[in-house]
């Protein structure tokens, strides 16, 4: 059985179709806001909020909640707002606040799971949460529809407020001077990133989420020069890498999250090489 025959065989299973749909949507959403975060030098906030999401999921597990997403989403959004507010406080700089909250949430989450978890395989559960697991291949139809709904909201927010996000990204001072509510749009960006991170936990795990946000944006910046082109290129690269990564992980039996990140890293290397060649050619 060749590769194409294997793909056709696996495509008959609903869980494979669900995984591809969700993976592509999460990759698309991550790439759209990734460009903004990289340009604003907020890349670390994705990593910080992913640790917070782990803490929220740990609390939901301890409370015996069958659906972790509502509580995890609420905790992550609340911390995104807190980090944004704290980052504007001159006493605690933004990067220090992110490090403090993320490390604290990660430590408390693991502590709670050790103290109160009834799982017989705690180490496996923690490892799966941190680095991703096969849970992306066991999605229910309701989870898929929830992901589709939230992804549509994220894309609509980005499209509807594109001009304002662009202005706040490149020159926040000028945006404020012309009447743009820069603080409000920064808050909107933080909330949307929190939603994306919670969605992405099933795909790549909490420790690898920032790769989905950073790698496509950095890869696109090696090839394109303006914001719109970088955003479109980032989206195409992110979706392509997610699709290839999920398919490769299914065929090779490797972890989904790590495989997607490995493909993203390879794409970044190729884009760097292509950027240098194009630069020399011009």
Where does each model-flagged region fall?
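Helix-loop-helix "hairpin" substructures at the membrane interface of multi-pass membrane proteins
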Residues: 139-216
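Membrane-interfacial amphipathic/re-entrant helices at transmembrane-helix boundaries
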Residues: 1-28
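Transmembrane alpha-helical segments in multi-pass inner-membrane proteins
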Residues: 202-258
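Transmembrane helix-bundle core of multi-pass membrane transporters
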Residues: 6-7, 102-159
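Alpha-helical transmembrane segments in multi-pass membrane proteins
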Residues: 22-30, 52, 56, 60, ...
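Hydrophobic alpha-helical transmembrane segments
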Residues: 20-24, 69-74, 96-100, 144-149, ...
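Short loop segments and helix-boundary regions at transmembrane helix junctions
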Residues: 35-120, 220-232, 249-253, 276-277
